[in-house]
Amino acid sequence: MIEPLLCGIVLGLIPVTLLGLFVAAWNQYRRGSALGG
């Protein structure tokens, strides 16, 4: 009974976590390239 809920939570968190890491890395990359000139 708990497995479907756990699978749903994991499947919902994985894309959000990956998106958050991607956005953070992208912002850091843009900031670094902007400061580097």
UniProtKB/Swiss-Prot annotation:
Q: Which superkingdom is the protein from?
A: Bacteria
An example molecular function term from Gene Ontology annotations = electron transporter, transferring electrons within cytochrome b6/f complex of photosystem II activity
Q: Which UniProt keywords apply?
A: Electron transport, Membrane, Photosynthesis, Thylakoid, Transmembrane, Transmembrane helix, Transport
GO terms (BP aspect):
cytochrome complex assembly; photosynthesis
Per the record, its GO cellular-component terms are: cytochrome b6f complex; plasma membrane-derived thylakoid membrane
User: Cellular location of this protein?
Assistant: Cellular thylakoid membrane
Classify the protein's membrane topology as the record does: Single-pass membrane protein
Keyword Signal on entry: no
Q: Does the keyword Transport apply?
A: yes
The portions of this protein that span the membrane are 5-25
Q: Which family does it belong to?
A: Belongs to the PetG family.
Self-association and partners? The 4 large subunits of the cytochrome b6-f complex are cytochrome b6, subunit IV (17 kDa polypeptide, PetD), cytochrome f and the Rieske protein, while the 4 small subunits are PetG, PetL, PetM and PetN. The complex functions as a dimer.
| Role of this protein | Component of the cytochrome b6-f complex, which mediates electron transfer between photosystem II (PSII) and photosystem I (PSI), cyclic electron flow around PSI, and state transitions. PetG is required for either the stability or assembly of the cytochrome b6-f complex.
The record's annotation in HAMAP family points to: Cytb6_f_PetG (MF_00432)
Name of the protein described by the UniProt record: Cytochrome b6-f complex subunit 5
The scientific name of the source species is: Synechococcus sp. (strain WH7803)
